[in-house]
Amino acid sequence: MARRLLEIASNSVASALAAQAGGADRIELFDNLAEGGTTPSYGSIAVARERLRIPLFVLIRARPGDFHYEALEAEIMLRDIAHCRQLGCDGVVIGALDADGNVDTALCQRLVSAAGPLQVTFHRAFDAARDLPAALEQVIALGCQRVLTSGGKASAEAGADTLAALVAQSNARISVMAGAGLNARNIAAVAARTGCVELHASAKAAQCSAMRHHNPALVGLSPDWTVTDAGEVAALRAALDAI
């Protein structure tokens, strides 16, 4: 089997560079990890594109919460896709549902069309759909190159059987990329069990603040943050290469 592709979800430019150093094949850049991810700033995308030597995909998501978007949010996402094209990104990561949990094909077709020559990944809005096999056919019809999914479960490990069924259903018409809860201990088993040849992980670690001064009155405002760990990325890569 061909070498399995490792995509790292990176919540900052620093995380993206760490992922590259660790051996990632591709970056998904986003902001607001704690809220499931939103579109990163123009500056973050621009600097990431300048610094990275590997493919850069950008999450297009106007806000946290559900995946049912209003016209204003759609306008914002279309503008963000235009910026990604302007900055030379390799792909965008999109997704939208209607109120009944079906793929919002009208909006998604606009997003895919706006992406033009860029590759398109349908994100984990897919896992929130009411009928995953039906949703997969809709995503394929949109012309997306891949779908990121945990098989509708809390983790790709828990959804491995569904992922395997989706891979079989796809019949090479689209790449089913496994993601959610993957680490160096389970990624090889998930890859082997599902047949997924693209895998998505965050490889995140806590970054402690270097501040010596801290105001204890600011309850809930932690000075620490989360970054991608290059060592964990390397461990993920090694685990996949050992299959």
Feature locations, PLM:
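N-terminal amphipathic alpha-helix/helix-capping segment at the start of soluble metabolic enzymes
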Residues: 1-9, 13, 49-50
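Hydrophobic faces of well-ordered beta-strands that scaffold small-molecule active sites
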Residues: 4-10, 27-29, 56-60, 92-94, ...
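Catalytic cores of alpha/beta
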Residues: 11-21, 68-83, 127-142, 166-171, ...
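Active-site-adjacent beta->alpha loops and helix N-cap segments on the catalytic face
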Residues: 14, 33-57, 71-75, 96-116, ...
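Glycine-enriched alpha-helix->loop->beta-strand junction motifs that scaffold or abut catalytic
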Residues: 21-27, 52-55, 88-91, 114-118, ...
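Glycine-rich phosphate-binding active-site loops on the catalytic face of alpha/beta enzymes
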Residues: 26-38, 83-101, 144-157, 194-217, ...
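C-terminal alpha-helical cap/extension of soluble enzyme domains
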Residues: 170-243
